[in-house]
Amino acid sequence: MEGSSNSPDRQSSGGSPPEERGGGGSGGGGGRSAAGEPVRSRWTPKPEQILILESIFNSGMVNPPKDETVRIRKLLERFGAVGDANVFYWFQNRRSRSRRRQRQMQAAAAAAAAAASSSSPSANTSPAAASAATVQVGLPPGAVVHTMAMGGSACQYEQQASSSSSSGSTGGSSLGLFAHGAGASGAGGYLQASCGASASASSALAPGLMGDVVDSGGSDDLFAISRQMGFVGSPRCSPASSPATPSSAATAAQQQFYSCQLPAATITVFINGVPMEMPRGPIDLRAMFGQDVMLVHSTGALLPVNDYGILMQSLQIGESYFLVARPP
C-alpha cells in the first residue's frame, strides 16, 4: 500500500526519466524518496527565468552543451530553485515548438504562393516593370535597361556602349550616377541612371560627373566613384557654382566625401529579445533602466558597472542582452 500511494507523486514530480524509471519498484523505492530530498511538483519557471531562457534561445544557443547548461542553471538559481534537467528539457521543448511553428509558417507561405499563382497573370506586373517599359521608349539601339532601387524608389539605368569620342555626352534626361571609364583609345561603357531629372539639371550635372572618369584613362578612381554616388558637393549648392578646374573639383569632392564618413552614433542590439538602438560607448545604466537592474549577456556573463552605474564596456553590435532585476 505504501508503494501504490507514492506512485502518483513520482509521476507528477517534474517528468524526468530517472524518477519514472526508479518509480516502478516496490514500497522500498517510496521509502528512499521519502527519506531523501522531498519530491517537488512539476517545475514552473518564473517570469525572470523565462525571460533569461528565451533570450538565450533567441541568441542562437538552441541546444546548449552540458557545461553551458550548468552555467544557465546557476544564473536561473538567483530567481528560484531549478535543476540541470529542468534546463535541458526546457530547451528540448522549446526546439520542438520552434520547429512546429516554422512548419506552420512554411505551409501558410506555400498556400499564399499557390493562391497568388492562381490569380490573373496581369496582376503580377509591378509598377517598377511598367515604368521600365515606358523608359525604354526612345532609347538608342543596343541599350539595355535595368531596374534598380534607390532610396525606396525604383530607378532605371541604361548600359550603353560608347567610344572615347562620345563618352563625355549623356542623354537629355539622364544622370550619370554610376560610370565605368572609357579608355583613351578603346571603346568603353558607362551606366546612366534615369531617375526622372529635368533636362536642364542633367545637362549641367552630367559633364562634371562623367568627365572625371574619362580623364582618369579608364583606371579605377575611388574618389570619382564617390563623387558619382552623390558626394559632389553640398546639397544647397547649385551645379553652376562648382569649381571649373578638375583638380579643385576633385579636392572639394574628396573633402566632402571624408566629412560624410563619420561613424554611427548608435548601434543595434537585442535587449530582452527586442531590437533597440543604443548609444555607442559608455552607457548610464541607472539613468536609462533604473536603479535595481543589471544587464546580462546572452551567454550568462554579467556586464560590469562602476559605482555610478556606468557600464565598464561598450555593447556589441547585434549581440543579445537582457535586463534582470537585482536579487533582494
Swiss-Prot record:
InterPro entries: HD (IPR001356), Homeodomain-like_sf (IPR009057), WOX11-like (IPR044558). Residues 1-45 are annotated as: Disordered. SUPFAM superfamilies: Homeodomain-like. Residues 23-33 have a biased composition (Gly residues). It is found in: Nucleus. One of its GO terms (molecular function) is DNA-binding transcription factor activity. Pfam families: Homeodomain. GO terms for cellular component: nucleus. Residues 1-11 have a biased composition (Polar residues). Its main location: nucleus. Keywords: Developmental protein, DNA-binding, Homeobox, Nucleus, Transcription, Transcription regulation. GO terms for biological process: adventitious root development. Residues 38-102 bind DNA. Transcription factor which may be involved in developmental processes. Belongs to the WUS homeobox family. This is WUSCHEL-related homeobox 6. It comes from Oryza sativa subsp. japonica. The gene is WOX6.
